[in-house]
Amino acid sequence: GVRGGVGTTTITAALAWSLQMLGENVLVVDACPDNLLRLSFNVDFTHRQGWARAMLDGQDWRDAGLRYTSQLDLLPFGQLSIEEQENPQHWQTRLSDICSGLQQLKASGRYQWILIDLPRDASQITHQLLSLCDHSLAIVNVDANCHIRLHQQALPDGAHILINDFRIGSQVQDDIYQLWLQSQRRLLP
């Protein structure tokens, strides 16, 4: 999303669920240090394991994968300590090996879809993961905050804009939406 709170994690979970309902094999990866995607898949709140947690602890990140259905696998981020949360510069560079792992999974053909819930930050690992993506969606709410951000911050190359939480009866949202129809060429219908 272009900012936190626009529903990116929820949309990622819903898309993963919908694709597996259509018979597609899906891996959904949480790349957000908040580690919230797992909650959309009924993973216990106290579950601390995840791919990043495993890598930081010197373990194999593949062991952190969870089978949700026969066609949907989840790779949670894992829980960071308070110290790690406050000092991301100390650990982010240690996570880059996940990129080659995801490339291998993509090449294996095991999954028709690998969905990555990316944080809205400019970290090195976020840029590395984004470079692996064939397509990207920038999730927005129709509000002044997202409107300003669409004009002030660059979207990833080729990203499409997907509106979430659009309220037809809101005059303010309709006004902003009308502006976007004229100014945002990558707006999904």
Task: For each feature predicted by the language model, list its residue ranges.
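Short strand->helix junction
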Residues: G4-V6, D44, D143
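A conditional alpha-helix N-cap/helix-loop micro-motif detector
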Residues: T9, R94-L95, P119
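P-loop/Walker-type NTP enzyme "switch/lid" segment
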Residues: G1, V28-K106, Q112
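Short histidine/acidic/glycine/proline-rich micro-motifs that form metal-
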Residues: R3-V6, S81, D165-I168
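Conserved catalytic-core segment of NTP-binding enzymes
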Residues: Q103-L188
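Walker A/P-loop phosphate-binding motif and the immediately C-terminal alpha-helix
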Residues: G1-D34
